[in-house]
Amino acid sequence: MIQVLLVTICLAAFPYQGSSIILESGNVNDYEVIYPRKVTALPKGAVQPKYEDTMQYELKVNGEPVVLHLEKNKGLFSKDYSETHYSFDGRKITTNPSVEDHCYYHGRIENDADSTASISACNGLKGHFKLQGEMYLIEPLKLSDSEAHAVFKLKNVEKEDEAPKMCGVTQNWESYEPIKKASDLNLNPEHQRYVELFIVVDHGMYTKYNGDSDKIRQRVHQMVNIMKESYTYMYIDILLAGIEIWSNGDLINVQPASPNTLNSFGEWRETDLLKRKSHDNAQLLTSIAFDEQIIGRAYIGGICDPKRSTGVVQDHSEINLRVAVTMTHELGHNLGIHHDTDSCSCGGYSCIMSPVISDEPSKYFSDCSYIQCWEFIMNQKPQCILKKPLRTDTVSTPVSGNELLEAGIECDCGSLENPCCYATTCKMRPGSQCAEGLCCDQCRFMKKGTVCRVSMVDRNDDTCTGQSADCPRNGLYG
């Protein structure tokens, strides 16, 4: 369903800018206040959906107008997504909540091919976007008389502490048959792999967030939304298979010694979790402070192994992006990726697999990471990530909306307010060329040569053909 929502955001012109404020993301020294005003263009008589499939936001950043394009992350959850918690008497309670109409988006800034965005629209707009090479955060302000939001640069958030944050993995990379350049991989969609991810939240996290399971759930969903974007350009699709919250106490000994915690968690996954929940990889999200400034640890090349397809990650920052990048890093180890060296590059940024986690983390993998990941996959051939899992949004509905594009169906119509596609027939509306895709804008193919995906490794950017809504893959992406 392609639905355009235009929200005009006006920049406040009084003393909020430049002052200091404590937000959910931390103590921010310089920020702007903006006010979303929704202007909806819907067909006459159409019903406003709770969360549109696509949205556009018009806003001012540093006094300049920009347009933020967002698209719902339809492949965020696997079909059998589940949530588990424990009652006060220790009973395991598992549900399969409906997550088809979720509120998590990814996107880009108009006329900025290097831009990215990861946004939650659950309660206002919360997340981050990159504009002209600078990372910005946005979140609602808790003001009773308005819908004010704060927008600020990530670098303007005060450091939570000065200690370096480290990954606990120390092994060196030993290549199988070294590939000299990432471009030698010649990856294409046939190489696509799929990781069904299960995240366990320990009791310390449950206590840290005052037993607010909804807040914990949203934090995890936001993290996976970020992780999915980073792995997309590696031809690896991340789907969230489930969440388990240890609400009545830890089921393993979570301790400051990260090797011991990782070992215990791996054993628990093998003997308990795998017997009751199908998934490919499990990550423990904990509030405990590990020894030696370590914030994460994982088994290198452990993917698909009952015990070793695991990692442990400290919830070390109020900024969800930083924790999400840490979990992306640890999952990278499970996929055979080692730490970057000085010769590795992802286009001038601090890359995901840096052994020291930056306060301004990157969502990009380096050229070395591509080589190591796909050398591992091609040589070790892990089987669990080969099969494409069903997604929540591929469930059949009375009016198509299932993305399968069966015979005779021209578009994924979804619902009645789709401006590009008839919901009753799943045929294109007159004048429409497309309904979705990186090279589709307002139901029309974007011009030939329009950059639709930026390569951070070899600068061989992907561009639209002018004949399709799809963005063809040419380059390699960090």
UniProtKB/Swiss-Prot annotation:
Top-rank taxon, per record: Eukaryota
Where, by residue number, is the motif Cell attachment site?
A: 456-458
The catalysed reaction is: Cleavage of 3-Asn-|-Gln-4, 9-Ser-|-His-10 and 14-Ala-|-Leu-15 bonds in insulin B chain and 14-Tyr-|-Gln-15 and 8-Thr-|-Ser-9 in A chain. Cleaves type IV collagen at 73-Ala-|-Gln-74 in alpha1-(IV) and at 7-Gly-|-Leu-8 in alpha2-(IV)
Q: How does it assemble?
A: Monomer (disintegrin).
Residues that make up the propeptide removed upon maturation: 21-187, 390-407
What's a single GO BP term from this record?
Answer: collagen catabolic process
| Keyword set, alphabetical order | Cell adhesion impairing toxin, Collagen degradation, Disulfide bond, Hemorrhagic toxin, Hemostasis impairing toxin, Hydrolase, Metal-binding, Metalloprotease, Platelet aggregation inhibiting toxin, Protease, Secreted, Signal, Toxin, Zinc, Zymogen
Query: Which cofactors is this protein said to need?
Result: Zn(2+)
Q: Which family does it belong to?
A: Belongs to the venom metalloproteinase (M12B) family. P-II subfamily. P-IIa sub-subfamily.
Q: Which Gene3D superfamilies does the record match to this protein?
A: Collagenase (Catalytic Domain) (3.40.390.10), Disintegrin domain (4.10.70.10)
Q: Record-annotated residues binding Zn(2+)?
A: 329, 333, 339
The Gene Ontology terms for molecular function here are: metal ion binding; metalloendopeptidase activity; toxin activity
In the UniProt record, the signal sequence range is 1-20
In this protein, which residues make up the domain named Peptidase M12B? 193-389
Where it mainly occurs, coarsely classed, is secreted
Keyword Signal included in the entry's annotation: yes
Note, other: Pro-atrolysin-E can be enzymatically activated by venom, atrolysin-A and atrolysin-E itself. The disintegrin belongs to the medium disintegrin subfamily.
Boundaries of every Disintegrin domain copy: 397-478
EC number, as in UniProt: 3.4.24.44
Q: How is the cofactor bound?
A: Binds 1 zinc ion per subunit.
Please state what the protein is called.
Answer: Zinc metalloproteinase/disintegrin
- SMART domains given in the database record: DISIN
What species does this protein belong to?
Crotalus atrox
Q: Give the CC-aspect GO terms.
A: extracellular region; plasma membrane
Organ and tissue specificity = Expressed by the venom gland.
Say yes or no: keyword Acetylation present: no
Task: Tell me the compartments it is located in.
Answer: Secreted
